[in-house]
Regions:
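Intein/HINT protein-splicing elements and their conserved insertion hotspots or analogous self-processing inserts
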Residues: 1-98, 109-193
Length: 193
């Protein structure tokens, strides 16, 4: 897994879902400091996709990096991730996990690692190696020797229970409960032509 930053900005919590959960908005919001860099990062990711190098990917937006990682795992019924945040440097873990600076996380097969790095380096786009998939149904995050574990299935239940409560109020067909009771039994299968 690799983190590709589109903002070229410091990690900021203003305007984030995290700030809102604390009844704040904040004025220190992430911006895109360099539009040309943003374009180059976007184009580099498109090259990766067009060459078939991306096994999985997700944008970093509402909820930040931790939400991105969780959402990448929610659709699967097996496996997790081992993630190291040490390459983010001196940033605190709250900002690393919850800042909503524009970017993406992509999964690249080991056999394509050199080609991935060449494409990114040739485009002048920064990236950080985050980690790799695991068999265990957890996202294990380490930073400066501290370890944090996020139970994917538990957090998926929390996530979907909120969606269910909203669906129950919005759905006119009375099927919200059936959808909620069934969501775990629908593994995601995709075929691309």
């Amino acid at each position: 897994f690799y983190h590709i930053d589109f903002s070229f900005d410091d990690l900021r919590l203003g305007g984030s879902a995290f700030a809102q959960s604390l009844n704040k908005v904040g004025s220190d919001v992430p911006i895109c400091k360099n539009p040309e860099y943003f374009r180059d990062a976007f184009d580099a990711v498109q090259t990766l996709v067009n060459k078939g190098l991306v096994l999985a990917g997700h944008d970093i937006s509402a909820g930040g990096l931790i939400t991105t990682l969780l959402e990448m795992c929610f659709a699967n019924m097996e496996g997790g991730m081992e993630i190291s945040l040490d390459k983010f440097g001196r940033h605190d873990i709250v900002k690393i996990l919850l800042a909503e600076n524009p970017g993406v996380v992509v999964q690249i097969a080991d056999k394509h690692k050199a080609e991935f790095k060449k494409i990114m380096d040739d485009a002048g786009v920064g990236y950080l190696k985050l980690g790799h998939p695991t068999d265990e149904r957890l996202i294990q995050v380490t930073k400066d020797g501290a370890e944090y574990q996020f139970g994917i299935d538990y957090l998926r239940d929390v996530w979907y229970s909120t969606s269910y409560l909203l669906d129950r109020k919005q759905s006119m067909n009375g099927r919200a409960k059936a959808r909620f009771e069934n969501y775990k039994m629908q593994p995601l299968e995709m075929v691309f032509n």
